[in-house]
């Protein structure tokens, strides 16, 4: 097994290059939080004698996580959010490097000598009812005996006491094409808590926001009428609703719908970016991101 650690300064500079923006020639100051990365690549031998389809099963992890922040209590809370989003609730209370090592160890144990382990069956059952903000949301969902699994995260926005990142998961269980998912997280760096959809929108926002989302998808796909989306691979447009899988920046809010959520899998994930001016009337003035909106 190869495990490597990337120190924070290099990564901080990389994140700054990727996410820093300029306004009238002035660079926007980022939050004073440092990151490191742990990289894991491990091949598990197939010990089930009935399985002759592959020489081994591969797990790859590229985990970027915060290591330094002025408020120690907030830092610990944010670190737990990162572990929870990347590895699942089971590992959230462990120190990050210990959590990664434990995940890698458990992964092998659950694959060993089983067609479908109890653990995998439990997480597979939860996949059908994934709740991006629910208390029982566990991102360690995986199929039975995947041929490979990739896990990575990326920082999307890191300014004005708000930190947004996305977790990417890809796996293949012997099907013609892999499964790919993106899960977005918005963190309030004043508290270390995750920011939820219900915290930033007024009551009864969903119908109005759904229409705005569908209109944005139609505009991006250059169709004359929103109903025409169904002719190019989208499912019933009346069933497209905000799914709580979003991130924010200083321009607007972006929703991600994963493959097959609202459209045929061949279309891939759908990303919907909406400027605040389009949704400001639906948003709360007392939310953790209100200073970005108003």
Predicted ranges, named:
Residues 17-20:
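C-terminal motif of bacterial Sec signal peptides marking the signal peptidase cleavage site
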Residues 9-15:
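Hydrophobic helical h-region of N-terminal Sec-dependent signal peptides
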Residues 1-9:
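Bacterial N-terminal signal peptides that target proteins for export
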Residues 22-294:
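Compositionally biased intrinsically disordered regions enriched in Thr/Gly
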């Amino acid at each position: 097994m190869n495990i490597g650690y990337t120190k924070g300064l290099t990564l901080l500079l990389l994140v700054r290059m990727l996410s820093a923006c300029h306004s009238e020639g002035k660079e926007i100051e980022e939050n004073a939080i440092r990151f490191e990365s742990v990289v894991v690549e491990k091949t598990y031998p197939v010990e089930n004698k009935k399985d002759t389809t592959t020489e081994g099963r591969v797990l790859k992890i590229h985990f970027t996580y915060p290591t330094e922040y002025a408020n120690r209590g907030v830092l610990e809370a944010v670190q737990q959010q990162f572990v929870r989003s990347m590895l699942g609730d089971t590992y959230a209370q462990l120190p990050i490097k210990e959590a990664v090592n434990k995940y890698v160890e458990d992964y092998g144990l659950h694959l060993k000598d089983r067609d479908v382990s109890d653990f995998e069956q439990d997480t597979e059952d939860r996949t059908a009812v994934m709740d991006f903000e629910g208390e029982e949301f566990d991102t360690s969902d995986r199929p039975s005996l995947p041929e490979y699994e990739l896990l990575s995260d990326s920082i999307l926005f890191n300014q004005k006491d708000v930190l947004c990142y996305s977790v990417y998961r890809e796996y293949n269980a012997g099907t013609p094409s892999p499964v790919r998912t993106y899960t977005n997280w918005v963190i309030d760096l004043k508290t270390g808590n995750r920011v939820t959809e219900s915290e930033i929108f007024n009551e009864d926002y969903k119908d109005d926001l759904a229409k705005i989302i569908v209109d944005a998808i139609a505009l991006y796909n250059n169709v004359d009428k929103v109903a025409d989306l169904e002719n190019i691979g989208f499912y019933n447009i009346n069933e497209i609703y905000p799914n709580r899988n979003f991130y924010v920046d200083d321009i607007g809010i972006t929703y991600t719908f994963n493959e097959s959520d609202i459209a045929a899998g061949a279309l891939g994930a759908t990303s919907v970016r909406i400027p605040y001016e389009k949704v400001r009337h639906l948003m709360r003035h007392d939310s953790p991101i209100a200073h970005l909106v108003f």
